[in-house]
Amino acid sequence: MFKFILVFLVIFLVSLPIFFTESKYYRGNISNHFNGKYFYNVSDLADNLKSKKHGGFFSYYLSKINYEKIHGKPIWQDKIITVKQFIPKDKIDDKSLHVSYIGHSTFLLQLQGLNILTDPIYSNIASPFSFIGPKRAIIPGINFDDLPKIDIVLISHSHYDHMDLPTIKKLQKKFKPQFITGLGNCYFLNNKRNLNLKCSELDWQDKIAISQNLNIHFYQAKHWSKRMMFGRNASLWGAFIIESKIGNIYFAGDTGYDSHFSIAQEKFKEFKLALLPIGAYKPEDFMLKFHLSPSQALQAHLDLNAKKSIAMHYKTFKLSQENYEDPVIDLEKEKKLRKIKDDFIILDVGKNLILK
């Protein structure tokens, strides 16, 4: 309890001086998911018009205590796991898609001569502080120095395990890629953190043309955003859809289950690949509002009409109360129940998959 109070006080005191300067990242027209001040999920419109709150740090902590009283503390990896790191090719010019799993929600996607990173995090701690927070449980599947020239970086939202500033700074210094993210995030990165990125902000349903044969769309997700203690829902979260000549790719970012998977399928018909989160789902009463369980990830896979799905967002950072192995165990159980075999897979960190 003392540790919890100490962490809260440190975060609060560090955040307080920047409350008035950092809580507003976007000013634009009111929409069905923006009330002029804050963004909200379409499915809980009524609640969000009244309040920008979804239940925060204290709500999670109380839920965590109650969960541990019944189930005990989660069994988690206490030493960092090493793997054989993959060395990717410089680029892929043929008609194939190369997918390399770096860990958590970070993938290297290589297609049509482009190298794309999703939600890159190479830090050892997913936190505003380098000394406290969720620690990395497994090394990145590709050494940073072995990354090919990165052309595009997709950032789904502002949480620390998805928008990792130390990694973004390293990518900018080495590659100067194009960053693509939701409304308000470029303002934060460039105006509040002075990173001088080539950065494009997208609203839901917006797209940006990368080349004649490749578009990147930003689509609805069910989540939220925040940096430090303040600025809740001041920037937009979402999923990315890469529309290419070799097929459509869906990157879910962080999301709870809702109709947005079916909405994407109605527009794009099918997906060659979907990257779907399966971790951070316990305690269910709190976490499933904005995260997928393995069962829900399988349903999302079906909703999207995905030919192949790869699991992500598990076994890298301890973000919730499931045991280290639970996401994979629960996914395999659900696959057996639904008779889904090789369409939804676990791609180990450091492994590469080629789709043709």
State where each predicted segment sits.
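Metallo-beta-lactamase
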Residues: F2-S130, P140-G141, G182-G253, K272-I278, D330-K351, L355, ...
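Catalytic core of the metallo-beta-lactamase
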Residues: H104-Q110, I210-K272, L288, L292-S295
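A short acidic, amphipathic alpha-helical/loop segment
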Residues: P166-L171, K192, H260-A264
